[in-house]
């Protein structure tokens, strides 16, 4: 049982302290709607991820390995976005919009050397996009993905 619990925690955050902090902040302010919630998350989520400026993060955004996420200035994460940034992380450039229920997922269980997701500036990741970064995915500046795009 303890082995299973350790495996679960290892797949959620870099360590137990980060897991507790991330989950506490998500539980406290992750659900708050409107501009009030966006404002609270813009300030408090800087404790668990790298932010180059203010970002608008809607309610219901799920984060795993938040310490491996970098958001540029003016990034927008819509409702239901899921960012899983293990191990080499996710970087989202200034002014980029990640639309609702998009999933950017880096879980490098095969230990591939170039895993990660890098999205340039002023890009758009459309609704319900799935981007898997195990082999490394780089998306340039001003790239627009339609809804339901999958990059594996």
Which residues does each predicted region cover?
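Domain-scale signature associated with acetyltransferase and cell-envelope carbohydrate enzymes
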Residues: 1-151
């Amino acid at each position: 049982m303890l082995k299973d619990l350790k495996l679960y925690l290892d797949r959620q955050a870099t360590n137990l302290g980060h897991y507790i902090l991330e989950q506490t902040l998500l539980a406290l302010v992750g659900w708050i709607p409107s501009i009030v919630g966006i404002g609270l998350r813009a300030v408090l989520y800087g404790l668990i991820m790298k932010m180059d400026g203010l970002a608008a993060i809607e309610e219901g955004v799920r984060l795993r390995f938040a310490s491996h996420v970098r958001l540029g200035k003016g990034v927008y994460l819509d409702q239901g976005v899921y960012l899983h940034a293990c191990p080499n992380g996710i970087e989202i450039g200034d002014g980029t919009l990640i639309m609702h229920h998009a999933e950017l997922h880096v879980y490098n269980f095969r230990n591939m050397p170039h895993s990660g997701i890098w999205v340039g500036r002023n890009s758009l990741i459309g609704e319900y996009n799935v981007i898997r970064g195990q082999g490394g995915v780089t998306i340039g500046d001003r790239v627009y993905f339609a809804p339901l795009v999958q990059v594996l």
